Structure formats: structure tokens, C-alpha cells
Amino acid sequence: MKIKLLCTVLLAMSFANTFAQSSKSTWGKTDYEDAPWVKNVSRPNEITEGLQNRHLSVWSSHGRYYDAKKGGWRWQRPILFGTTEDLYTQTIVLPYLIPMLENAGAIVFTPRERDWQKNEIIVDNDSRTNYKEESMKKKWATTSDKGFAQHYGSYNDGENPFTAGTARQVKARKRNSKISSVVYQPTFLETGRYAVYVSYQTQKKSVEAAEYIVFHKGQETHFRVNQRMGGGTWVYLGTFEFDKGNSINNSVVLTNHSSHRGIVTTDAVRFGGGMGNIVRGGTVSGLPRFLEGARYSAQWAGAPWNVVSKSNGSNDYNDDINCRSLMTNWLAGGSCYLPEKKDGKKVPIELTLAIHSDAGVKTDDSYVGTLGICTTQDGNKTLGDGLSRKVSKTFAEQLVANVKKDLDNAFHINWTTRSVWDRNYSETRLPEVPSAILETLSHQNFPDIKLGQDPNFKFTFARSVYKTVLKYEANMHGKTYTVQPLAPNNFKIEYVSANKVRLQWRPTTDASEPTATPTSYNVYVAMGTRGFDNGMNVRNPYFDIELLPGIVYNFKVTACNRGGESFPTEVLSALRNEGATQTILIVNAFSRLSSPAVVNTSTEQGFDLEADPGLSYGPVAGWAGRQANFNKAMMGKEGPSALGYGGEELVGKVIAGNDFNYVKDHAEALRHAGKYNIVSSNSKAVEYGEVDLSKYAMVDLLLGNEKDDGHSLYYYKTFKPALRQQLTKYLNNRGKLFVSGSYLASDMQGVDEQDWLKNNLKITFDGANYDNYNSVVSGMGMSFDVYRTINEQHYGAYTPDYILPVDNAFSTLTYADGKTAAVAYKGTDNSVFTLSFPFECIKDAPTRNSIMKGIVNFLMKK
């Protein structure tokens, strides 16, 4: 008996040692080195030490789902402080994290709809509407397998659109002549940004470099798609600006030109995220698809029923959690990372990450903070290709530690972390590749969400996560990494000859990342009404370009290195007018990003969206509605009596934020104002003395909604001392200044600041205009509307200033209540026109042109 027991123990020890030796802590020699699923071949910068050829699955938590027990569509988490987790985490993942990963070269799959576009247009070979084939040397034919087909109206649960139609195929051709092609030319109901998804079939002889060309607002971007993987679902190419209507300049073309022999296949092409169309309980959600859970997107993407609904239709809540990982496994099956799963799509996804927020409160105004979650004790003993599950714990630990380090370094806040839980969670148990859940913060604790709704917090948080993914992947493959740079600063444009301008900027240092140094820059150009091109990579921090006359040129710049590309600068503009002898300078001083107005007293907490909804980085779909309950005594409760409870009137609205492209609105209006050249600059370049204002016949200072609000993580002041100094010097030299902004007087409450307004702008502060629902402004021979409220088209002039003229200045525009909205001054010393709302908030372009012409004539004519 003792001998038998000893043998059993020895056998167990031998098995344990064998298992320990066979399970890996890195991918080792396992590495995908063939053509990526999708490659943008128009990218001007080369990435060699980033996330190139890495395929990742990343998602934001929850989403609207159908509750079969209670009978109705509902959120998975409660509405608190104007949002819900179902909405909030998307505002980190979609505008920040995924773009950072893609800028590093990664191919990112996300199981929830990623496009904040409510319209959807599908062009398909089965309907033939807006679909056109051209067969040259090689002829298009129908494949033997089922493909996508769309029918009118909604879809029943379990109905797979990718088995309802057909697909097409053609032999590939190496020669770049007599090329066969398909044109997908949709009719867009609205101008806007649309995600482009293609679909095709993977066959035995499929090519690994199918050529797709996206035509967008007169530009074209080329892609290579590896059709040896990922057939029979939607494949994301990118998001592009398209014009309203039907035009070849806004289309997708697939050709059979390829460097490889084989077959090119094609099916439907989808433009835009669209509205939810899956019926549950007899009804659709009634919301955009991007607000729904992943379960419904998975069905629309052709996933098998056992992936879409593990519960077989009985529990959508569980299905939504499970299908994210199951869809990742389905796509990755058969790749080098999941070689044993033969029935998959062979997409080499090697990492999953779920971004959540959490509940919990602190009564002492401290942070609940960040938590990591992994699963090492449940599920399969090893991950794909024999990888130890413990690698997921390493990933989760690094995510949490780096978030604290980066947030503390950036904002000096002593951010709280809550270690890492190693527990049985579906999103970390089911994936067959390394995985983690990151609970960003507590959406129930106001100190957390107060920071969490600041766009600069979101950027820094997302950048920390991106950097952790980058470093983790480099370690897993034994590679060198380089962190992508930060966006350039002090961007300016100046004339260097009669028809040539120079764009110039400074690199931004990232003190926490020594590798994040730019080695080159991408310069993007848009002429007139055309969209931005694909960029030109330059080595130096400047770029000269000759301008054609009469066309407004728009520019933006990114910083690059071996690790990838930064976010862009703001858009600056320039115009050359034949025969012009004077130049007008537009100065962009509107860089504010902020949460809504903060209420934080001994008895009340929350966001006051009515006073100021804040400014997101571009549009955002993260708000549910205005907060109704501010009572701190109800902290930690749920339902209508809870602190933070509010409405749902903003659900489904993609609310406009700071797009950083308002200089072009001013430039376009100035183009109609007379025969002047136009250049522009960021205000920091002016503050640093890098721009000589005395060279310009007129300065147009764009302040937008800039102000020091007292709660933002960064300091946004309308007239900083350095800017005031430069403007005073300019005005003392008979300068001509046009300045517009919502808070240009209320943000100047110090005695010296008020004196500066009186002496230089000839105005005083006369209170705030709280009547945001009366948008009419009158004067200068017209009445017109101004954006004043939360909307989807343009940020609003929320509670703008009333101003009064002093000395010989006079009122020129009034709000609906008769109080002054604009003051003009013309003296022997200088001329000033002050507008107490942002010029770009005038809704109608012809009205902007007329108002600008009147202002320029007043300032420039003697």
C-alpha cells in the first residue's frame, strides 16, 4: 500500500514538473510574421518598434441589453452623475485607447460597435444597388459558399445575415493592367465620418493582399487585406469623412490586382455604425448600435449562434459578457496562437482587454481607484499554444501599477489602486489568449468620476494602458519597443515668400518615457472642401509649401518615431490671395477640454450640465442625461433617491465637443471679407514670442469656450499674462484686433485683469447670459442664431458673457434680451472688435461671412 501511494505521489510530481516545463511564460518562438489582417499602405511613416502586426481584442464594458425576465431593454448598470458604465467606458476606449493602439500599428478588433455614426449604408452584390462590377482579363463569378444579404427591417434573434446571400470571386492578376474591379458607391444622406467595413470569403486559394481603395472627400487611401483569414464577417478598414450624396469620390473600390496568385473574393461593404436592428421580446432597442451590448453586434457580424448566445436565447446579460471572449476565440481559432481550434477564422489575435468601471463610495472624499482582474485558477490549465495562464496576472498587475504611476506623474493626485483580483470572471476565463479586465475607477464615487470625466484624465489613462500593452507585447515576444510621441506644440504658419508659407512646430517632451522622442513628423493637408490627404513624412520640425491662390489650405501635424504616431495638432489654415498686400493672422487660443461644471459642497455633489456641459475631445456619446439628485446624504444608494441619479434625455446623442478645427471657419469667413492673405498660429507660439504680431494688418483671436473653470486638470485661461503682454504691445502699435469667446470678460476678475480689459478691449463685464434657450443675436443689419445648448452639430456658447463698452467704444450686437453681445472701438491708437460669444458658434455660414466682412471693414478701413 505504501509503495502504491509512493508511486502515485511520484507520478503526480512527474506530471507537475512536466506541466511546469510545458507551460510557457512568453510566446517564445510563436509569432505571427505574415501579412496582417488589414494594412493601411498609404500610411506615410514606418513603424518597426511598436505594435505592428499585433492583433488585439479590446472592448468597453456592458451596453444596452434585453432583460427577458423583466421584459424590456435596459442598461446593465445604473445611471449616476449623468452617465452609466455602459456609456462611460466607451469614452475612454473609442476616442483614446483604440486610436493609440492603431497609431502604434496594431490591428484592433472590438466586439461592440465602434462607430459613433447613427447612419448605416450597406452596398452588396445581391442587391446590386450602387454596386458595379468591371471584368477585364479575369471575370467575376459567384462563389459556392453562402454570403451576406440584407433584408428590409429588423432581424430576428439567431438570424445570420452572412448565410442569406452570395459572394463574388475573381482570379488575382499580378500585372497592373486589365484589372477587374468592383465599385461600392453608396448614397450618403448626411456629410460626416463613417466607419468602413468590408466583407469577403476566405477560400483555399485566397490572396493575402487584396487591394481596397477608399475614396473619401476627393482623397484616396489604399489598404491590403489578408483574405486568407477573417472571411464571413465585417472587417474594419478605417473611419473617413464622406460627403452627402452619391459620388465616385466617396466610395470603396476592390481590385483583383495582387502580388500573389490566387482568388480575390468580395461581399458587402458597410458604411457607418447604424441603429440596432436585432429584435428581442418583439422590439428592437431603438438606440444606435454603438450603445448596445456586444451580443447584438456579434449576430450582425455573422458569428455562429453558439458564440452569439451561449444561453440559447434565454439570458442576454450573460450572452453579452460571454460572446466578447467567444467571438475573439472564434476569430483567432486556427491561428498560430490558437492552433488547436481548427474551426476559427485564423486571425492571429494574441491579447484581450476589457475596460470597465466599478461601484463603491468613499465618504471621506478619497478615491476608490483602479482594480485589475485576471483568472489563473479556472478554465483551461493553459492558454493557446501552451501558454501559462499566469501571464494574464502579469498583464493585469502591470496595467494597475502603470496607471497609478502615470496618473500621479501627470496630475500629482496620489491615485488609489486596489491590487489585482485573481478570480473567476468570464471575460478573463474564456479567452484562450492572455487577458485582463481593468476596472478604471468607481462611477459611483464622485471624486473618481470628477477626474474620470476630464478628457485629459481619459487621455493619460488610455496612454498608460497603451504603453503597458506595448511593453507587455514586446516582452512576450522578446522585442524592442519605442513609445509613440506626444503631439507637437507651438504650431504656426508664416509666409516666407510671396506664394510660399512655412509650417513650424516644436516637439513635445514626455518626461516619463525616454523613448517617446519624435524622429519625424507627418504633415496632413486639405485644400478647400476636400478632405485631408494621407500625409507626408518629414524629418525636420517645419515644412514649406506653395499655395495656389484663392483656396483655403488646412493643415495638421503629428509626431512620429519607430513606435508609431501621435495624436494631431489643431487644424491651422492659410490662404493666398493674388495681389494681396496685407496679411491677417488667426490665433487659436481655444484648447480647453473639461468635464461639466462641478458642484461640490458640504451637502451637494455632481455635474451641472445645464450651467456648462464641458468640452470633450471631439464628439462624445457618453452622456445619459442631466443629473437630478445632488444630495450627498444619499451617497451609495441606487434609484431615484440616490446621489447622482438623473435623466436619460441625452441617450443616443453624439454631443459636439472641441474639434480643434475652428481656425478654418474663421479663415473661410475671412476669404469672403476682402483681398487679404491669411495665416494662423497656436496661441502658445504667440505667448513665447515666436510670432511677430506687428507684421500683421489684423489679428483674429479665437478664444472659443476657453476659461479657467477651477476644476479642470489643466489650466485654461483666456488671457494669460504672456498673451496679454503680446496683445498690448500690438495694440500700442496701432494694431487691429478681433477677439471672440464666451468667457473673455468673466474669466478676468482680478483688478489688474479688469483694468486690462478696459484699457485694451474697451469693455467691462456685465454678468452672464443664462438664457441658453434663446439663441437669437441681433445687430449689424441682421438677426441670426447662435449655438447655445447641448447639440450634435457644434459646441455651444453656454452662459456667455454680457459686456459693456467703455470710453468711446459702442455696442454693435445684442442678445435677445437687449444686452450687449459685441463692442466695437475705433480710435487713433488702435481698433478693436470684441464678440462675447465664439464667432464659429454662428450657425449659418453665409451669416458668418457677412458678419466677418463687416468686422474686417470696420477694423481695416480708415
Where would I find each of the regions flagged by the language model?
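Aromatic-Pro/Gly-enriched surface loop or interdomain linker
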Residues: 81, 98-104, 112, 281, ...
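Active-site microenvironments of hydrolase-like enzyme catalytic domains
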Residues: 291-389, 421-444
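Pro/Thr/Ser/Gly-rich low-complexity, intrinsically disordered linker/stalk tracts
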Residues: 472-515, 549, 563-582
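A glycine-rich, often tryptophan-bearing local segment used as a flexible ligand/cofactor-contacting loop or short
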Residues: 705-817, 846-853
